[in-house]
Amino acid sequence: MGDRPRRNCGTRRRRHNELFDALPVRLFSATGRGPIEVLVRWDGERFVEMPGHVATIDDAPETGRFEVNARAYGLMQTLCDLVENGAVLTFDYGYPQEELWAPFRTTGTLLAFYKHTAHEDPYIHVGEQDLTTHVNFSELQAAAEESGMDVAGLVSQSEFLYCVGLGQVVEQARGEMGEYFTRRRALEQLTDGAGLGRIRVLAATRGVEGEPPGFEGCQ
């Protein structure tokens, strides 16, 4: 993306879905001396963890484990700098920093998915499973604002889709029951509060008057 021109002319909309939660992260463990990075080595039979150096991290949790996504801030700025007039829409699992690093979240958010089953051991099925962490939306908002963007959100994907009128799209198919039930099942899946509906949506806009579609009255 670094080879692309900055601030493309015209109105642009850039949407990305679950981009930031797929980036590599650094894992830390809070101690009385400060956060210590959790490193990994091979002991000849398996991957094992080992303590790294004490790090300085602003507002770091005082207990438990947490992740830092070192690439998210710069990537968000790169995306924003590609837009002269328009919006960057971010769809991802995550929280504002105060929720992400809340005291009760002592094990962090690192998860592994193997054959569509979630578990918490990233050191098995190496190369055969997906690893993911929740996104720090406070960091993405700060990056967008530093790039001169206006920020709207956070809202849930469920709120966003209903606000842009997806419910009406379903109702428009009532005259054709097969299509109606297909659309309704899709809407239920996308807005399920225990699943995809929990995805958060953040909008960063430039040259857009008022709140962007999907965010009016939803915050």
Show the residue positions of the predicted features.
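Long, Lys/Arg- and hydrophobic-enriched amphipathic alpha-helices
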Residues: 52-219
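Short, flexible loop/hinge motifs at secondary-structure junctions
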Residues: 1-3
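A mobile, often basic/glycine-rich helix-loop segment
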Residues: 15-61, 103-114
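A short SAM/SAH-binding and catalytic strip from SAM-dependent methyltransferases
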Residues: 5, 9-32, 65-70, 74, ...
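A generic structural signal for well-ordered coil/turn residues at beta-strand boundaries
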Residues: 10, 34-36, 198
